Amino acid sequence: MPKVTLIGAGSVVFAKNLLSDCLSYPELSEGTYVLYDIDQERLRTAEKMAHQVAKAWNAKPTIVATTNPVEALEDADYAINMIQVGGYEPCTVTDFEIPKKYGLRQTIGDTLGIGGIFRALRTIPVMLEYADIMEEVCPTSPSSTTSTRWR
């Protein structure tokens, strides 16, 4: 069974949707799902949610929660990123407010325009740290190969 690491699992709604999608497949329903986040409180919430989702799907996954990125990514078959560096407030709100202040319409703050640039500048350094860890502890993961190939 695969080991799937959810990076930023404290984004509970996003994690719930991803986990539910994964557990809906019999091939993935007994895998190991590692929930990783830097925020212990949000991680505990995500862990409770993961057990509820597994029960709802009548799935029997192994659920692990950790704040240690090396432990989370070690031997991972897949790593799914859902981090939001800086959080919703103040960062995402600012991503919309600054363009608006200068008369620019910000459509989708996480990928386009001025807000997308702000988010990229916050996120890329953190993602490079995870890519370095992945290169060491799960080099055969497709996520690892694609994240480090371009460097």
What are these language model-derived features?
Residues 1-93, 102, 108-112, 116-151:
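Metallocofactor- and cofactor-centric catalytic cores in central/energy metabolism, strongly enriched
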